[in-house]
Amino acid sequence: MGSINGSKVKTIIIACDAGMGSSAMLAARMTQKLSSFQVSVKHSPVNQIPEQVDLIMCHEGLAARTRSLRPGKVVVPFKLFIGDPAFDKVIAAVRDSADITG
């Protein structure tokens, strides 16, 4: 598990199996919420997550695989695609320069 201060987060990847539907929708939503903080939010299949990423968010069922593919990166899992508190936690940490662990 890694940790990062929200003020250091400049790139977030929303990862899913295919990197198309659900992750694209979530990336668009997070982009809107984080636009005033100059944070880039993109989507990707788990197997293609780029090295240059500060934080990865993925469904909890993909968290172990994501951590094994990108060791040392902060991985924040979520359960629900809509309304999960993990998204609000990340947004608040970026806004408040708080630590994010995952």
Predicted regions mapped to residue ranges:
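A short helix->loop->beta-strand "cap" motif at the edges of active sites that frequently abuts
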Residues: 70-73
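Short, Asp-centered acidic motifs that coordinate Mg2+ and/or phosphate
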Residues: 55
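Alpha-helix C-terminal capping/helix-to-coil transition sites in glycosyltransferase folds
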Residues: 51-52
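Conserved active-site segments centered on acidic
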Residues: 2-46
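Structural signal for conserved beta-strand scaffold positions within catalytic alpha/beta enzyme cores
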Residues: 43, 58, 76-77
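Glycine-rich nucleotide/cofactor/substrate-binding loop typically near the N-terminus or early
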Residues: 59-60, 82
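Ser/Thr/Gly-rich flexible loops in soluble cytosolic domains mediating phosphotransfer, phosphorylation
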Residues: 14, 76-102
